[in-house]
Structure formats: C-alpha cells, structure tokens
Amino acid sequence: MKKVNLSSKWIISISLLIICDYVYLIRTNVNEQANAEATAHMHYKINNTKHSKGKLD
C-alpha cells in the first residue's frame, strides 16, 4: 500500500511540474507576441510621421 501511495505522489508531483512549465511557456510566448505587436505599431507610427512630415515640407 505504501509503494502505491509513494508512486502516486511522484506522479502527481511530476504532473504539476509539467503543468507549471507549460503555463510558464505560454505566458512568455504571449508576452513576446505582445512586445512584437507593440514594436511593430511603434514602427508604423514612426514611418507614418516621417511620411506626413515629408509631405508638409
């Protein structure tokens, strides 16, 4: 009986560790996508500003 309890504790521990790793990877991936979108939006604004200034001159 004790061997079953011990192995089930190991299985639960490893499962929780794997779940935590997946959550961490998903969160970092979402943050990288948000940063990339923000950077692209800034480049778009900068380019539009440069073009509009060129048209005014």
Curated annotation (Swiss-Prot):
The protein's name in its UniProt record: Protein CgkB
Naturally occurring in which organism (per UniProt): Pseudoalteromonas carrageenovora (Alteromonas carrageenovora)
Gene field: cgkB
